[in-house]
Amino acid sequence: MTHAHITTWVVALILFVVAIALQAKGHEKTKMLHMLLRLFYILIIATGAWILHSMSSFPFLYIVKVIVGLWVIGTMEMILVRTAKGKNTNVLWLQFIVAFVVVLYLGFKLPFGFSFFS
């Protein structure tokens, strides 16, 4: 299930970048892509919940990773919505980068992730 979770994250990040690029050009298909990205948010949460459910106990760092992961999803959504409305997104981009780095670190550090930081 870890691979499914990582795959949904990668696809969601690609869709996010494409949606931002299309939004900058004023493309008409951006709304459809945004809805598809929301579906991937649900898949990310579902696969993450499945991974968490498969564990026998919930150490504190896993709970932190869940919260930071939801923070990443929230900032992605807020960036897309505020960009569509023409509002400033600088603070949201900073939050996204910080949260993304933290969630990647926790994902690779914790036992269910890949061992880059052992």
From Swiss-Prot:
InterPro entries: UPF0344 (IPR010899). Keywords: Cell membrane, Membrane, Transmembrane, Transmembrane helix. It is a multi-pass membrane protein. It is found in: Cell membrane. The keyword Acetylation does not apply. Pfam families: DUF1516. GO terms for cellular component: plasma membrane. The chain crosses the membrane at residues 4-24, 32-52, 60-80, 96-116. The keyword Cell membrane applies. HAMAP family: UPF0344. NCBIfam families: PRK13673.1-3. Belongs to the UPF0344 family. This is UPF0344 protein Aflv_2205.
